[in-house]
Amino acid sequence: MAEQALDKIFIRDLRMRCVLGIYQEERREKQDVDINIVLEADLSQACRTDRIEDTVDYKAVKKEVIAMVEESQFYLVERLAERIAEICLKPPEVERVSVRVAKPGALRFARTVEIEIQREKEST
C-alpha cells in the first residue's frame, strides 16, 4: 500500500535580523536573513471540518521562529536552519519540514548564500 502524500504549508520570505557569522565584523550588529519554510502535514481533517484545531497553527509557528531568531546569535547558517526546523516540528500535525535560510551579501559578487535542510519527526 502506498504511503499517503502529505500536504504542504508554505511560509515564504520571512525577513529578520540576527547576529550571524564567524568573523568579528559579522558579529558587531544584526544582519538580514531571509527564511522560507515548508511544513508537511496531513491536512485532510482540516479540509473537511474547516476548524483551526484540525490543522497546523502556522501563525504560532511563525511567532516562535521570529522570537528565537531575533533573540539568538549563531556562527553558522546551518545551525540557524536546524533551530528553525526544531521549532517547526513541535506541532503534532507536522511530519516533515524544509527550511531555507539565505544570508544576503555573504559572498562578494553573489546576491545571497542559502542553506536548505529537510528534517522529519523521529519514529517513536
What are these regions (language model features)?
Residues M1-T124:
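N-terminal, polar/charged subdomain of small-to-medium soluble alpha/beta proteins
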